[in-house]
């Protein structure tokens, strides 16, 4: 390799400077991750070369045997990671190693918790793994040449992690990247064959290409041969191609960490080989935690796609529906061509058939997790429940299956935890109940004592309490489960069916008839703010409620539309009053029209507050309430 020429000194992007300081001064409890990250990057470089060489075989430069080499020099206190993958041009080195184009660094810094172990685990997830080299090194030198460029177009990138880096042109006959770490004082233990082999075994055994280290000679063989002998220190076979019976849980877990860029263990996995009409292997994982960008429109999602063990692309989104975007893993097909493109993957019988089967496989995996490990499923639900709730709208064919995986709070459990499955609810239904009742609201605390629940508590009927912002939208698609319809208890057309006896219904009709005059007076007082005023048959303790009018949007859906800047259609609630409540009896007896109007307005505003709505005229409400309080205290 010739001497550096055309040398430049450049400054790191501001966020990278912050990141380097963090790496150097904070993440020192789990130092060995540097090797995991650099080897993972080298494996990705090999995958990229394989893919590009499908179209341009010349990129292989006569050598298609890809490998990673890890070496060390005790005396010089260096560790070297060398690959013969795709390599980098000078421009690549500046852009990839000096700046971070995406918002990965800023997001990484924002998500730091102060817990070293947790923070170290975030490194790969946020695509900043290269900088972990500075945990153990006070100087990092990168020598690289992109495949297809002449030897004279090599690049030497160098930095001490202090805010600047140097980049220079250099001759590099071999394509690929060599990273030389000058270890800090006190980190000499990493310049050791046994230590490096153990770290590689722990983190990188699953990598699908050989990781080589120099053969070490001891005792009588201590004299090193003239040429170093290299030996493979990992299994170097694609994990998913091996029989399930031969793979340990720890191997699946390490493979997940590599494929998902996550240092935590998965909650579950499913490894399957399909033969017959289609021939493919899949290995799917359920992560243990949600990525920071799960709900970002342009977040990374999809499976790693291989065709006949040749890497084709990351993030092949076509094999799973969007609501399962959190599933990680690989699919290796023998039915797709090696020159498959994202456009070709958009449709077609092979892709559609694989998507259908993989979706079912993923849902089966979640069902098994829920059944066998409910605590782990609760963890899954906390992380990914809202994404799964998109399922009934997106995946009609699996609507019932997805519904069975959903979890809600309910009046059966006073903790407010989202732990109730629909099958649990159905199993607890009372005699004569043929509907599944639910109530939506902003929070469990806000709706657990809602007046809408009073009649259900009286009759001992469980009501699901839906408090995620997506829930009302979800229920517009999830209309039934187990052949039983869902009913929103906040709607004005609530019918309890067989749960009300004929005697109850007759008595209700008589009371409604006797209070028609009061209903008319209240309607006149409230005017156009209500669609209708009527006697309520659902209240036992509260004086009044506001029910949702027929065909109107509920409060949650209106708030969702407002937040997204969409026009919200005008709605008018139904005002229902409890004729047996003392306040309503006083209202009925009130002859002063102004006072009657004030009382009616106060009851209307209180009902709106109880429903979680905001008041159109809060100052008017306070004024009327103060006036009534003064009269009471006079």
Swiss-Prot record:
Chain intervals for the UniProt region annotation (C): 560-634
Keywords for this protein: ATP-binding, Chaperone, Cytoplasm, Nucleotide-binding, Stress response
InterPro entries: HATPase_C_sf (IPR036890), Heat_shock_protein_90_CS (IPR019805), HSP90_C (IPR037196), Hsp90_fam (IPR001404), Hsp90_N (IPR020575), Ribosomal_Su5_D2-typ_SF (IPR020568)
Positions of region (B): 343-559
Pfam families tied to this protein: HATPase_c_3, HSP90
Keyword Nucleotide-binding among record annotations: yes
Gene Ontology cellular-component terms listed: cytoplasm
GO molecular function: ATP binding; ATP hydrolysis activity; ATP-dependent protein folding chaperone; unfolded protein binding
Cell compartments where the protein resides: Cytoplasm
Gene3D superfamilies assigned to the protein according to its UniProt record, in alphabetical order: 3.30.230.80, 3.40.50.11260, Heat shock protein 90, C-terminal domain, Histidine kinase-like ATPase, C-terminal domain
Cysteine disulfide partners in this protein: none
SMART domains: HATPase_c
Stretches for region A: 1-342
Record flagged with keyword ATP-binding: yes
UniProt family annotation: Belongs to the heat shock protein 90 family.
Entry function: Molecular chaperone. Has ATPase activity.
Subunit structure: Homodimer.
Full protein name: Chaperone protein HtpG
Source organism of this protein record: Xanthomonas campestris pv. campestris (strain 8004)
């Amino acid at each position: 390799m010739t001497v550096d020429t055309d040398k430049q000194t450049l400054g790191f992007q501001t966020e990278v400077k912050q990141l380097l300081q963090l790496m150097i001064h904070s993440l020192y409890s789990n130092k060995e991750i540097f090797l995991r990250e650099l080897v993972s990057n080298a494996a990705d470089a090999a995958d990229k070369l394989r893919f590009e060489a499908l179209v341009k075989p010349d990129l292989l430069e006569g050598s298609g045997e890809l490998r990673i080499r890890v070496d060390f020099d005790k005396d010089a206190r260096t560790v070297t990671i060398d690959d013969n993958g795709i390599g980098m041009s000078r421009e690549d080195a500046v852009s990839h190693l000096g700046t971070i184009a995406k918002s990965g660094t800023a997001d990484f810094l924002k998500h730091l918790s102060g817990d070293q172990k947790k923070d170290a685990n975030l490194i790969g997830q946020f695509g900043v793994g290269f900088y972990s080299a500075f945990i153990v090194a006070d100087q990092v030198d990168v020598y690289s040449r992109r495949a297809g460029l002449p030897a004279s177009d090599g690049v030497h990138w160098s930095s001490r992690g202090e805010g600047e880096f140097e980049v220079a042109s250099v001759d590099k006959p071999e394509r690929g990247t060599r990273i030389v770490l000058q270890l800090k004082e006190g980190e000499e233990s990493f310049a050791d064959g046994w230590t490096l082999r153990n770290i590689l075994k722990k983190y990188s055994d699953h990598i699908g290409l050989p990781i080589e280290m120099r053969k070490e000679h001891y005792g009588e063989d201590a004299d090193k041969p003239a040429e170093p002998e290299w030996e493979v220190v990992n299994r170097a076979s694609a994990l998913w191609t091996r029989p399930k019976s031969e793979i340990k849980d720890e191997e699946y877990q390490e493979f997940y960490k590599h494929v998902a860029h996550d240092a935590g263990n998965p909650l579950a996995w499913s490894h399957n080989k399909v033969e017959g009409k289609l021939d493919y292997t899949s290995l799917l994982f359920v992560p243990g935690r949600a990525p920071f960008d799960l709900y970002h429109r342009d977040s990374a999602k999809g499976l790693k796609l291989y065709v006949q063990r040749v890497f084709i692309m990351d993030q092949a989104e076509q094999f799973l529906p969007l609501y399962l975007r959190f599933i990680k893993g690989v699919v290796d097909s023998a039915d797709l061509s090696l020159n498959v493109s994202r456009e070709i993957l958009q449709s077609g019988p092979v892709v559609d058939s694989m998507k259908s089967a993989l979706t079912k496989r993923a849902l089966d995996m979640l069902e098994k997790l829920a059944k066998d490990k409910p605590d782990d499923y609760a963890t899954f639900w906390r992380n990914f429940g809202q994404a799964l709730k998109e399922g009934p709208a997106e995946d009609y064919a699996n609507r019932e299956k997805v519904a069975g995986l959903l979890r809600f709070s309910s009046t059966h459990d006073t903790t407010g935890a989202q732990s109730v499955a629909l099958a649990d609810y159905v199993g607890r239904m009372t005699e004569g109940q043929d509907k599944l009742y639910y109530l939506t609201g902003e929070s469990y605390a806000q709706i657990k004592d809602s007046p809408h629940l009073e009649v259900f508590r009286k009759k001992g009927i469980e009501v699901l309490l839906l408090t995620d912002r997506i829930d009302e939208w979800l229920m517009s698609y999830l209309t039934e489960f187990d052949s039983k319809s869902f009913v929103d208890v906040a709607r004005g057309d609530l019918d309890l069916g067989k749960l009300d006896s004929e005697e109850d219904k007759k008595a209700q009709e008589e009371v409604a008839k006797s209070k028609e005059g009061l209903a008319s007076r209240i309607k006149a007082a409230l005017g156009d703010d209500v669609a209708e005023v009527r006697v309520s048959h659902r209240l036992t303790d509260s004086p009044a409620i506001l029910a949702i009018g027929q065909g109107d949007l509920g409060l949650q859906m209106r708030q969702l539309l407002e937040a997204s800047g969409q026009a919200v259609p005008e709605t008018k609630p139904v005002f229902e009053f409890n004729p047996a409540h003392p306040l309503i009896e006083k209202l009925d007896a009130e002859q002063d029209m102004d006072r009657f109007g004030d009382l009616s307005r106060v009851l209307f505003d209180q009902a709106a507050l109880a429903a979680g709505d905001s008041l159109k005229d809060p100052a008017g409400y306070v004024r009327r309430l103060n006036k009534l309080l003064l009269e009471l205290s006079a």
